[in-house]
Amino acid sequence: MKITALASAILAVAQGALALPARAPALDITLSQVNNTRIKAVVKNSGTEKITFVHLNFFNDPSPVKKVSLYRNATEVEFTGIKQRLRSDGLSNDALTTLAPGATYEDEFDIASTANLTQGGPVTVRTQGFVPIAMNNKIAGYIPYSSNELELEVDAEKAVAVPASIKPLDRRTKITSSCTGNRATVLNTALRNAASIASKAADAASSGSSALFTEYFKSTSGNIRSAVAARLKAVASEASMNGGGSTTYYCSDPYGYCDSNVLAYTLPSTNEVVNCELFYTLQEVTNDCHGQDQATTIIHEFTHAPGVYPPGTEDLGYGYSAATALSTSNALNNADSYALFANAVYLNCQGQTGGQTTWDGYSQPGQTEPGTQTMWDGYSQPGQTEPGTQTMWDGYSQPGQTEPGTQTTWDGYSQPGQIEPCTQTMWDGGSEPGQTEPDAQTMWDNFYQA
């Protein structure tokens, strides 16, 4: 039933390339074979501007993360490494890479360490997705990446000799002995919150706002809505089982792959979920649209686990701006799409950025967000009008002005003589810009205090 719902949904949408912004900077990945299953990736900044991005869950991450996808006879080979959820701000400098235009770096890794290639034979290797860009050690947007397609002929005997990155542990209990005392209390509360939030999100996916659903999944199709609802219901069910479900939960890191930037990670091949130290610093439930918390981190991780709902999701777009740029088929397969949608349903965040920078800080500052909310473009049109609150900026040091009564002010450039609602006239653009309008409303004084 689960597989049928998801399969029919995916078949209903195009399986083409990721939906990419037209002018976005990008990273080009060139894959080549070093020997047998050892691969070299050359990462190149193909844009015209310097970029700083998060290389965790990407090339140069020393953890056994999914850097490439492997296919045998058009069927993807199971990944046996880890899928991490990263913090969105306060990133350490060692998690970041900066590349000048045209600059490159290399990463070598062995694909047999995170996949069973012991039968040998032909294997196809490729990768694509979005990598988060960072400003002031905070995720501020995304850039796309894609690679060539590499065809390998794997020597089975040599592949067998490659040690697996993850060694099996004794998983006799569903919630392990690492979950005691305060950590057990924290986990149980987080699971209850995750169950409640995922259940509400499942209902919203089935029959809630079509605009909100489209913001994250780019479709109003009944099949797509049913597929999203089914996965979220499965997540809610798993979180409600308090250790009796399909996943094994660790309250501390038995494998040693947590660091100061990782909230939690999942081993999809064994349906294991691990909380990192950073998890315990998160709020139980955030009040910020698209913020991170313990509850949605569990939702994110449970979507990775195929034992909860098959197949498990990937990390194709991380953070609000990347997740909402994905095509329908890719959003269905993206963990953060579910976590962010659940957060948006819970907080009623339709069309809101909630502190997440919507433009990418580089070549596309003028992003138009779902729900018809247009962001300012940072250049020639400072006087954008936002829905509802109609926030303006004066072109100088105070871009986020909010006018009383949702009244729109002049845009600081070519139209100073705006006529406002209720026939109230703004300053006339001539010699007396500091007019005092009816009802004691003082206009802009033609300098720095809008």
Swiss-Prot record:
Alphabetized GO MF terms: metal ion binding; metalloendopeptidase activity
Keyword Signal: yes
Active site: E301
SUPFAM superfamilies according to UniProt: Metalloproteases ('zincins'), catalytic domain
Cell compartments where the protein resides: Secreted
Alphabetical list of PROSITE patterns matching this protein: ZINC_PROTEASE
Record's keyword terms, sorted: Cleavage on pair of basic residues, Disulfide bond, Hydrolase, Metal-binding, Metalloprotease, Protease, Secreted, Signal, Virulence, Zinc, Zymogen
Record field: catalytic activity: Preferential cleavage of bonds with hydrophobic residues in P1'. Also 3-Asn-|-Gln-4 and 8-Gly-|-Ser-9 bonds in insulin B chain
Cysteines engaged in disulfide bonds, as pairs: C179-C251, C258-C276
Protein name as annotated: Neutral protease 2 homolog AFUB_070680
